[in-house]
């Protein structure tokens, strides 16, 4: 009896499994009949297996590359997969497509070894003495990622001693970002460069581009033009008139704004500073703000502040007229929010903050400067207030501040939120900051420098997802303070937030060399800094 029931049940089950699927039936019902298995680690395992065969066991090499007498036993497939140059070589009708041995003339043996390391391993140690050659060769062999990383490295390390050579190199390789970085260095150090061999042999079109981009009058650009012409007067005299016509001199602009309070007053004061090349800092003006300030940023040459008795009002300090002008107010009251300038969109973004009811906000709105209009957009992933903000190529990095814990009490935050101003999307980085709470940040090239309470300045590289800690002078670390930071003229300036009246100190860091210089005795009336803007 039991066997009959079992046989009957088995027949019913098979009949059910073999019957055509009814419309709307779930695919899960046929899971044990068939399904597609996808091995998610397959491609990585295959790649690792191929590399092991090629490198560790040195099997299947089918081409020999000879460079300066040294022979490299390599693989056409691997070279072609990484480099369009080699793919074209091996698939063309040229003799290199069939030759077992190929001789390369335009690269040194040591640099080609670095290229092989990169092609096979994906890692390469970039050295300053070979960087320019690696930059050129990686472009020639169409190793795009390596070329772009070399470009970023060169842009970070460009300085007076190599800026003209780097500018010429970037021009040859049609690299606008590197070209702009080198040109900025050249025009702000023209007085130092005008007697160098590199400057005197500079092509006419590069000199024209430098002097037409706005050279500070302190760099004596007219004298530099004369020096260039006189070096080869017979051939260059014809360019004299066009060069003088192209020259655009600019005055010494305000570089840094300090916003803070005097000990005896309740409202804020805006002090404008000029940072000279000899490390001196002078006060070029000051403006009284008859209001409490809750947020501020510098956009172009103008200063924008939000505050007032109704904390949604905004004013602009016109750098040309030194007058305050009304701007469109924010859509709603906001405290402790973060203002960030995005020049590429001619806009100012307001992110996070607190409501008047002391509730954290995740709102993001932006101000279109040309239209004098505020517009709401998508929200932050995590509501924060008092965060540091930095714009890097249209991505706003919101750092630290305060966030809610699980019980909705505020706590110091270590989060890094990234808001893309092109897509209006926000995401949180999977790693956190090395410290929490209130901090201040400034961008230098493709790096973000962050300073907080303590004795450390941190350099954050978003491209590499890495942090580098730089120590401040011991005299500063003895008295904990929330420091402020600004990026100006290729240097990083750090200010303490409290001073003895009338005597402020700051220190200047050169990111290329890590050299630190201290500037003492800046004569300002501020005793408590709220914002430092550059």
Swiss-Prot record:
The BACK domain covers 163-255
Q: Where is the BTB domain?
A: 61-128
Supply the Gene3D superfamilies for this chain: 1.25.40.420, Kelch-type beta propeller, Potassium Channel Kv1.1, Chain A
> Is the keyword ATP-binding assigned to this protein?
no
Name where the Kelch repeats lie. 255-301, 302-344, 347-394, 396-446, 448-497
For this UniProt record, give its keywords in alphabetical order, as a comma-separated list.
Kelch repeat, Repeat
As given in the record, the signal peptide range reads: none
Q: Which CDD domains match?
A: BACK_KBTBD4 (cd18481), BTB_POZ_KBTBD4 (cd18272)
**Record's keyword annotation contains Repeat:** yes
Q: Which Pfam families match?
A: BACK (PF07707), BTB (PF00651), Kelch_2 (PF07646)
Describe the task this protein carries out: Substrate-specific adapter of a BCR (BTB-CUL3-RBX1) E3 ubiquitin ligase complex which targets CoREST corepressor complex components RCOR1, KDM1A/LSD1 and HDAC2 for proteasomal degradation. RCOR1 is likely to be the primary target while degradation of KDM1A and HDAC2 is likely due to their association with RCOR1. Also targets RCOR3, MIER2 and MIER3 for proteasomal degradation as well as associated proteins ZNF217 and RREB1. Degradation is dependent on the presence of an ELM2 domain in the target proteins.
Q: How does it assemble?
A: Component of the BCR(KBTBD4) E3 ubiquitin ligase complex, at least composed of CUL3, KBTBD4 and RBX1.
Q: What is this protein called?
A: Kelch repeat and BTB domain-containing protein 4
């Amino acid at each position: 009896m039991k066997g009959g029931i079992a046989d009957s049940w088995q027949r019913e089950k098979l009949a059910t499994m073999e019957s055509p699927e009814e419309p709307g039936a779930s695919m899960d019902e046929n899971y044990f009949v068939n399904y597609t298995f996808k091995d998610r680690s397959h491609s990585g395992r295959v790649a690792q297996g191929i590399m092991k065969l090629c490198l560790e066991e040195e099997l299947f090499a089918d081409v020999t590359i000879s460079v300066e007498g040294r022979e490299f036993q390599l693989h056409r497939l691997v070279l072609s997969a990484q480099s369009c140059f080699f793919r074209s070589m091996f698939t063309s009708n040229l003799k290199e497509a069939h030759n077992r041995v190929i001789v390369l003339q335009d690269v040194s043996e040591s640099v080609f070894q670095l290229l092989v390391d990169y092609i096979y391993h994906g890692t390469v140690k970039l050295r300053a003495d070979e960087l320019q050659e690696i930059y050129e060769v990686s472009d020639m062999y169409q190793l795009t990622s390596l070329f772009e990383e070399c470009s970023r490295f060169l842009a970070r390390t460009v300085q007076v001693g190599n800026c003209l050579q780097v500018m010429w190199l970037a021009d040859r390789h049609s690299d606008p970002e590197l070209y702009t970085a080198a040109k900025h260095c050249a025009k702000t150090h023209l007085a130092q460069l005008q007697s160098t061999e590199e400057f005197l042999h500079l092509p006419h079109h590069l000199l024209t581009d430098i002097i037409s981009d706005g050279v500070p009058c302190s760099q004596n650009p007219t004298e530099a033009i004369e020096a260039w012409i006189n070096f080869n007067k017979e051939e260059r005299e014809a360019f004299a008139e066009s060069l003088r016509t192209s020259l655009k001199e600019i005055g010494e602009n305000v570089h840094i704004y300090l916003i803070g309070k005097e000990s005896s007053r309740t409202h804020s004061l805006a002090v404008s500073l000029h940072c000279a090349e000899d490390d001196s800092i002078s006060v070029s003006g000051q403006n009284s703000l008859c209001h409490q300030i809750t947020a501020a940023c510098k956009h172009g040459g103008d200063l924008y502040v939000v505050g007032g008795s109704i904390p949604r009002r905004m004013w602009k300090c016109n750098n040309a007229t030194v007058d305050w002008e009304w701007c469109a107010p924010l859509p709603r009251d906001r405290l402790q929010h973060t203002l960030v300038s995005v020049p590429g969109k001619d806009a100012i973004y307001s992110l996070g903050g607190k409501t008047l009811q002391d509730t954290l906000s995740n709102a993001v709105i932006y101000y279109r400067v040309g239209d004098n209009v505020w517009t709401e957009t998508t929200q932050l992933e995590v509501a924060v207030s008092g965060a540091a903000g930095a714009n890097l190529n249209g991505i706003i990095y919101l750092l630290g501040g305060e966030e809610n814990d699980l019980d909705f009490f505020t706590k110091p935050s270590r989060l890094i939120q990234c808001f893309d101003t092109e897509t209006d999307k926000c995401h949180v980085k999977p790693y956190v900051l090395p410290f929490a709470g209130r901090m201040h940040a400034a961008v230098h090239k493709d790096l973000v420098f962050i300073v907080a309470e303590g004795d450390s300045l941190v350099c954050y590289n978003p491209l590499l997802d890495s942090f580098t800690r730089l120590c401040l002078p011991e005299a500063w670390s003895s008295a904990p303070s929330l420091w402020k930071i600004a990026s100006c003229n290729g240097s990083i300036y750090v200010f303490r937030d409290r001073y003895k009246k009338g005597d402020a100190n700051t220190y200047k860091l050169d990111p290329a060399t890590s050299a630190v210089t201290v500037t003492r005795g800046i004569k300002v009336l501020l005793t408590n800094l709220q914002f430092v803007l550059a």
